[in-house]
């Protein structure tokens, strides 16, 4: 293969590439002693090091370090006001969630704090969290609303997300989660709140270009199937993709409903059954595992991993970063947890934070793979093997982070 190189191209030389490309017949799509050629914001070519002659363009010798696609976190609640650490302490001291809620705690505490926070306050706190994700190699992240629960404050949250996307070297997928829970003012009339979402919040914020998918908490303590379907029908009228928090605490059938609307993903899924798994297999919907919430809530029922494998359902892994049930801004830790708690293999976990996570956000195949034509979003690690990245926690093996072809975190010297 002959490549005509330009002076502005960049060659990342002598690498171990975990491409995650299904066309590469090896675990992790691993290629040893290969060069990665970047032109502008995309990968131009991947070739054996010996096959590519040095030209006048920039050459960066990574000295057999591991290069992977940039990590993708496909489920976070990154923007919120307040802090729930005191509530966690109270729970650890024996107070029940019902008692905390009666005192104004729980999700309503976050809603109140978020409503009381200014744009600037929310931007500052969210920026600190986002910086932590980027420092671990995340190049694409999903961020949900869901702590405003009225038009004004859901718009405020999504405007903060938009601001973060405009001022950081990371791709952000914004999701409308107005159907997170009923706000206090609609506590006894959830159908009326769903009216507000479907008739006002969703269409107005969609027309302002503030989100790209709709999510819902479909659960016995959230919204029922009929209410969830009303939301999906409203989204369908605007051709908006849907996804759902489903089967976390009980089996309600939410996964099958998401699949019926060809949803992007079903998330949590501890109580998913075989009928639900089969529906996901037919629709191509991604199963997103959230081990941080499983750990923090001390759950005991794991998602049906063997069934997902049996029916070839793509599995993604995410942090579910949020203040109440998963306050962990580390996708590497979620990867470790997914292996230890759920029994995923390291390769399944890597697929879950690259190719399958990209699919869960409607971004395959230009994200989550190292291949010609994909975006040049990748990470150089001080490591030899993919499993090294999340085996040992407590220090960060990231050497260089590249977003759209540009180094954003680096300790490599050009050679």
Swiss-Prot record:
Keywords from the UniProt entry: Cytoplasm, Histidine metabolism, Hydrolase, Iron, Metal-binding, Zinc
Binding positions (4-imidazolone-5-propanoate): 84, 147, 180, 248, 325
Positions of transmembrane segments: none
Key word Iron present: yes
SUPFAM superfamilies (UniProt xref): Composite domain of metallo-dependent hydrolases, Metallo-dependent hydrolases
Location (main, coarse): cytoplasm
PANTHER family found in the cross-reference section: IMIDAZOLONEPROPIONASE, IMIDAZOLONEPROPIONASE-RELATED
Enzyme type, top EC level: hydrolase
Residues noted as binding N-formimidoyl-L-glutamate in the record, renumbered to the chain: 147, 322, 324
Cellular component, GO, one term: cytoplasm
Similarity field: Belongs to the metallo-dependent hydrolases superfamily. HutI family.
Reaction catalyzed: 4-imidazolone-5-propanoate + H2O = N-formimidoyl-L-glutamate
GO terms, molecular function: imidazolonepropionase activity; iron ion binding; zinc ion binding
Binding site for Fe(3+): 75, 77, 245, 320
Pfam families from the UniProt entry: Amidohydro_1
Name this protein carries in UniProt: Imidazolonepropionase
HAMAP family, per database record: HutI
Co-factor requirement: Zn(2+); Fe(3+)
GO biological process, one term: L-histidine catabolic process to glutamate and formamide
EC number(s) per entry: 3.5.2.7
Gene encoding the protein: hutI
InterPro entries: Amidohydro-rel, HutI, Metal-dep_hydrolase_composite, Metal_Hydrolase
């Amino acid at each position: 293969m002959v490549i005509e190189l330009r002076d502005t191209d960049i060659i990342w030389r002598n690498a171990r590439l975990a491409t995650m490309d299904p066309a590469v017949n090896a675990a992790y799509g691993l290629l040893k002693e290969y060069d990665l050629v970047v032109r502008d914001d995309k990968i131009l070519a991947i070739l054996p090091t010996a096959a590519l002659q040095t030209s006048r363009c920039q050459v960066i010798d990574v000295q057999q370090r591991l290069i992977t696609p940039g990590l993708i976190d496909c489920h976070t609640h990154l923007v919120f006001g307040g802090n729930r650490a005191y509530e966690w302490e109270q729970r650890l001291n024996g107070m029940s969630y019902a008692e905390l809620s009666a005192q104004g705690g729980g999700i309503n505490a976050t809603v109140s704090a978020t409503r009381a926070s200014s744009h600037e306050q929310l931007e500052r706190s969210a920026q600190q969290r986002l910086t932590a994700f980027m420092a671990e190699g995340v190049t694409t992240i999903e961020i949900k609303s869901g702590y405003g629960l009225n038009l004004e404050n859901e718009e405020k949250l999504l405007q903060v997300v938009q601001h973060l996307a405009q001022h950081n070297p990371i791709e952000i997928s914004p999701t409308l989660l107005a159907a997170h829970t009923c706000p206090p003012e609609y506590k006894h009339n959830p159908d009326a709140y769903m009216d507000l979402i479907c008739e006002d919040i969703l269409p107005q914020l969609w027309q302002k270009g503030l989100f790209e998918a709709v999510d819902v908490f479909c659960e016995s303590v959230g919204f029922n199937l009929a209410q969830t379907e009303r939301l999906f029908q409203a989204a369908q009228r605007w051709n908006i993709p849907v996804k759902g928090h489903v089967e976390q605490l009980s089996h309600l059938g939410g996964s099958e409903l998401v699949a019926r609307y060809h949803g992007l993903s079903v998330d949590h899924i501890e109580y998913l059954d075989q009928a639900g798994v089969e529906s996901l297999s037919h629709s191509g919907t991604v199963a997103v595992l959230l081990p941080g919430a499983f750990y923090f809530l001390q759950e005991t029922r794991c998602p049906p991993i063997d069934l997902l494998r049996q029916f070839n359902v793509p599995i993604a892994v995410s942090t579910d970063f949020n203040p109440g049930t998963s306050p962990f801004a580390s996708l590497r830790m979620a990867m470790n947890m997914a292996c230890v708690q759920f029994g995923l293999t390291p390769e399944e976990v890597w697929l879950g934070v690259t190719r399958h996570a990209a699919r869960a956000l409607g971004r395959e195949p230009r994200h989550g793979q190292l291949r010609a034509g994909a975006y040049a979003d990748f990470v150089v690690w001080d490591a030899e093997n993919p499993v090294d990245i999340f085996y040992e926690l407590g220090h960060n093996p990231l050497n260089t982070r590249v977003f759209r072809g540009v180094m954003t975190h680096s300790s490599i010297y050009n050679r």
